[in-house]
Swiss-Prot record:
First-tier enzyme category under EC: ligase
Coiled coil location: none
Reaction equations catalysed: L-glutamyl-tRNA(Gln) + L-glutamine + ATP + H2O = L-glutaminyl-tRNA(Gln) + L-glutamate + ADP + phosphate + H(+); L-aspartyl-tRNA(Asn) + L-glutamine + ATP + H2O = L-asparaginyl-tRNA(Asn) + L-glutamate + ADP + phosphate + 2 H(+)
GO MF term (any one): asparaginyl-tRNA synthase (glutamine-hydrolyzing) activity
NCBIfam families with a match to the protein in the record: gatC
Protein name as catalogued: Aspartyl/glutamyl-tRNA(Asn/Gln) amidotransferase subunit C
Keyword terms, alphabetized: ATP-binding, Ligase, Nucleotide-binding, Protein biosynthesis
EC number per UniProt: 6.3.5.-
Entry's transmembrane regions: none
Organism: Rhizobium rhizogenes (strain K84 / ATCC BAA-868)
Membership in a protein family: Belongs to the GatC family.
Length: 95
């Protein structure tokens, strides 16, 4: 895949970026270079390579999933103008 001048101008317009003719021409070469690098990456054989999310192996600490009220219901509704049993009361908007 390659990028032409019209594509650069269209992307700049969609991104609301002001680009003059010289900058757009320079970006054509830069974007084509980036796309060429991505195409090289897609040619690499990664069969059998385990996916990784970090360069260092680590595992997230697990905790039990407990349902609680958070013990902050009163603090949350403290500044609300209308409440009832720790629920916000709002005006009816749909009949």
């Amino acid at each position: 895949m390659s990028v032409d001048l019209a594509t650069v101008k269209r992307v700049a317009h969609l991104a609301r970026i002001a680009v003059n003719e010289d900058e757009a021409q320079r970006m054509v070469g830069e974007l084509n270079g980036m796309l060429g690098f991505v195409e090289q990456l897609s040619e690499v054989n990664v069969d059998g390579v385990e996916a990784m999310t970090s360069v260092t192996p680590m595992a997230m600490k697990k905790r039990t999933d407990e349902v609680t009220d958070g013990s902050k219901a009163a603090d949350i509704v403290a500044n609300a103008p209308n409440t009832d049993q720790n629920f916000f009361l709002v005006p009816k908007v749909v009949e």
